[in-house]
C-alpha cells in the first residue's frame, strides 16, 4: 500500500529529474541524481552482468523505453551502453489507439509527450556512435537489412537465424499478445494510409505533424 509520504517522495524525485533535464550542462553536474535512483541504475547493471554470465551472452538487449534511464546508464558506462530508438509513424500509432476506443487527444498525447522528452535527451547526451534510430516500417519491410545495420552497430556478425524468434528459448515479461504467438513475427501495418482520412487525419497533422516530421516521416 502506497502511503502519502511515499507518493510525495516519488513526485519530488520526478520533479527534480525533470528540472535537471532542462539545465545547461555546466549546471547539470551540480544537481546529481537522488541516491536511490543511482542505486537503481547500479542494480540494473548488476542484473545485466548476472544475465550475461548465466546465459553466456556478450550482448543484453533491454527493451525498456525510459529515455532518461538510458541516458544515465550511458553516461555512467559509455563504452558498454548503446541506445536504439525505435520509432513508428505517429499516424499508425494514432489510428491504432483510436481503433481501441481512445479519444483523439488520448490517441496522440502519449506518443507525442514521449518523443518530446526522449528526442532532446537522447540527441543531447548520447554519443553519436552509441545512438541509432530505427524505423518500425523499415524493420518490418526489410528485416535482414535492418538486422545487418543493428549488428554492425553493436559490433557483431549478422546471422539469418536471428530473425527466427521461434528457434530460440525466450523469457518474456509483460508485452503484447505476440508473446503467445512465437511464429507470428513482425508484419508491416500501414492501415493508416487508407483508413486515416478527413477530420481524423487533419487532427493528427495539427497536433502531431511537427513531431512526425522530426522523426523523419512525411
Show which residues each predicted segment covers:
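PAPS-dependent sulfation machinery
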Residues: 1-60, 207
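PAPS-dependent sulfotransferases, especially Golgi type II membrane carbohydrate sulfotransferases
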Residues: 23-32, 36-39, 98, 119, ...
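Phosphate-binding beta-loop-alpha motif at adenosine-nucleotide cofactor sites
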Residues: 58-61, 125-154, 191-195
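Conserved phosphate-donor/acceptor-positioning beta-strand/loop module used by diverse small-molecule
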Residues: 62-66, 72-98
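Short alpha-helical
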Residues: 68, 92, 141, 145
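Short, hinge-like loop/turn segments at secondary-structure boundaries
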Residues: 79, 100-104, 150-152
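Short hydrophobic/aromatic-enriched beta-strand-loop microsegments
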Residues: 80-88, 104-108, 159-160
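Lumenal/extracellular "mature" regions of secretory-pathway glycan-modifying transferases
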Residues: 99-114
